[in-house]
């Protein structure tokens, strides 16, 4: 006969788990074959939950080494410089012409990732099989590879005395109400003129959020505030994005690289530290061979150390590709000090680079 037990105290140990998927389409794949160890690298990506950790995928169309020369090799690579390793499981598959998953292979265990270390499958798919079924696996000469990553976070204990009931967010958030004031120009008391476009706003909100606007309003005469305040050297769309952040704390269009590039100087000029950080994060996520040089110049100009470090690391990692761009060739004369810093970063990367680790995968039926 079982007996109910009464516990005077209790607790739990939990581990956070983060999951995300990334889809990568390689166009004109038949022209990317190259030789053994010739690789193709994806754009840098990260999860929505953790923008600090950057990843990329690598594909070796003719294998990562002589042993895999008849296979397609695929890898997941950790790019971020972190103080501790990242433990993660991952799964690769191909999307065929019917939109179906093909050749699903997953890591057999949780793997340890260090900076610049790659884990994956050097014998992911026989190349002859891929080419003989090109209509199905390479529609319009495009290879679409997907990777699902499961990151194991830190374990933490939850004693009973520390657990409190969750409080739901109120239905109408303060930011929504302030956003309505901005969108509908309700009860405004000032007008800002940007490239011929008038924007109605509230001095109190602008002064509370931006030290530059605060100083502007403190030193302006009452009579002059009756006329529109001219805002120079700003695009109306960029100004609108900045004002939306001032009122709501949100900047929904920073996923656009050009928008993030334009908003960053505005955030710096008007003392919007949080918006500046959001721009940094967005630009770090969108680094590419084409824009890395301009991003480095921008980061240096506006003293964004995190973005500058990421740009230097990216340039060091893709040095041969970046050096072929017209943007890089122009920086040799315009910003020689940045070229010197890039070479220092490249030298450090060469010294700390770790040999890739390969794990053998198994087909998942």
UniProtKB/Swiss-Prot annotation:
| Residues in coiled coil | none
Q: Where is the MATH domain?
A: 19-149
Source superkingdom: Eukaryota
- Which residue numbers delimit the BTB domain? 188-250
Q: Which Pfam families match?
A: BTB, MATH_2
Q: PROSITE patterns this protein is in?
A: BTB, MATH
Task: Provide a GO biological process annotation.
Answer: protein catabolic process
Q: Which family does it belong to?
A: Belongs to the Tdpoz family.
State the name under which the record lists this protein: TD and POZ domain-containing protein 1
Q: Which organism is it from?
A: Mus musculus (Mouse)
């Amino acid at each position: 006969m079982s007996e109910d037990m009464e516990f005077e105290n209790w607790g739990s140990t939990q581990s956070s788990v983060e999951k995300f998927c990334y889809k990568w389409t390689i166009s004109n794949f038949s022209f990317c074959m190259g030789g053994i160890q010739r690789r193709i690298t994806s754009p840098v990506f990260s999860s929505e939950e953790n923008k600090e950790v950057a990843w990329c995928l690598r594909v070796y169309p003719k294998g990562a080494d002589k042993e895999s020369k008849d296979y397609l090799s695929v890898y997941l690579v950790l790019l971020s410089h972190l103080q501790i390793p990242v433990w993660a499981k991952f799964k690769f598959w191909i999307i065929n012409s019917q939109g179906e998953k093909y050749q699903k292979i997953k890591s057999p265990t949780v793997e340890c990732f260090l900076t610049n270390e790659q884990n994956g499958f050097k014998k992911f798919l026989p190349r002859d099989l891929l080419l003989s079924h090109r209509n199905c696996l390479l529609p319009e000469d495009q290879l679409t590879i997907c990777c699902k990553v499961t990151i194991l976070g830190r374990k933490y204990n939850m004693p009973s005395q520390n657990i409190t009931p969750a409080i739901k967010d109120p239905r109408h958030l303060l930011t929504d109400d302030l956003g309505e004031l901005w969108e509908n120009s309700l009860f405004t008391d000032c007008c800002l003129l940007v490239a011929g476009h008038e924007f109605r706003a509230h001095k109190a909100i602008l002064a509370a959020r931006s030290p530059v606007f605060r100083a502007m309003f403190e030193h302006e005469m009452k009579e002059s505030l009756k006329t529109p305040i001219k805002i120079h050297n700003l695009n109306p769309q960029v100004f609108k994005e900045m004002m939306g952040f001032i009122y709501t704390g949100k900047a929904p269009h920073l996923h656009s690289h050009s928008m993030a590039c334009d908003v960053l100087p505005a955030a710096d000029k008007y003392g919007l530290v949080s918006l500046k950080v959001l721009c940094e994060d967005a630009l770090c996520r969108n680094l590419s061979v084409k824009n890395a040089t301009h991003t480095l110049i921008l980061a240096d100009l506006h003293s964004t150390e995190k973005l500058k470090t990421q740009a230097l690391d990216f340039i060091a990692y893709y040095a041969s590709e970046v050096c072929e761009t017209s943007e890089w060739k122009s920086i040799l004369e315009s910003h020689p000090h940045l070229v010197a810093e890039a070479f220092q970063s490249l030298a450090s990367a060469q010294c700390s680079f770790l040999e890739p680790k390969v794990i053998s995968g198994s087909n998942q039926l």
